[in-house]
């Protein structure tokens, strides 16, 4: 089982990219979202045994979030519940399909997550990231779960998925990020997030430092230009992006997270040792699968990751 730990929220996505003339503003369409939520959903759709570990509101949005997971086979028994409202993220879609977000997260249910007693014995990997690693007091509980999972020998994956507007002290966050790395097996991040985290050091030097701190691999995504993996031994393997007409990029990175974990599992590589021993051929297969999965998500509005049947066929 792959456990995904983090927030579930509602994305409010404009029905069109810009208002016309003096007419009304575009309607905002509610869609299920949150980086970890999207990752869990994508794992379920790909056919991986997956569970979601979070705190979700008992309001109507919360019920819909859980219904969506269950419909795609995701175990929700690790979800804590609360009467506080669901976090809202208002999306701003650029002409190229990229998305920015404004968050309404004060006093919401997901940020009151507490450390669970234990994960199921079947848990072989735990994935973390996004707002849940920033917003207290829940962030400290997720961090504790990351550390405990690593100490228990469980494969851990981290996608920082930076939301700069939620980070009050960037330098403090960067220091906290570096403190997580000894407990991370696989670090995946976008090129933009890597640049933000690296600061003046530069991405190339920073990635070397991050690898030296603990991860067995770092995967960098470059949007339509594809993605690459870097390893502590200095290897770099890259694959191109899959060409598609982009509706928007919401959930694309989350789909990559799920596709990486799903395909790593297929290669028997959900452990630090087996991850470090993967061949270039295996990595090209894993990265190529992730690129194709993300392209499907980008081809339709909102975070709608692909089902396994949509990825069958010529590569």
Features from the language model and the residues they span:
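Short, conserved phosphate/pyrophosphate- and ester-handling motifs at nucleotide-, phospho-/glycolipid
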Residues: 43, 190, 253
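Short beta-strand scaffold segments in enzyme catalytic cores
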Residues: 41, 88-92, 226-230
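Glycine-rich phosphate/adenosyl-contacting loop at the front of the ribokinase-like
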Residues: 1-75
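Structural motif
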Residues: 1-3, 124-125, 186
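Active-site metal-binding loops of divalent metal-dependent hydrolases
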Residues: 8, 35, 131, 160, ...
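Conserved phosphate-binding/catalytic region of the ribokinase-like
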Residues: 3, 201-315
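Conserved beta-alpha-beta core of the PfkB/ribokinase-like small-molecule kinase fold
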Residues: 131-208, 225-226
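Conserved N-terminal subdomain of the carbohydrate kinase-like
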Residues: 49-130, 154, 315
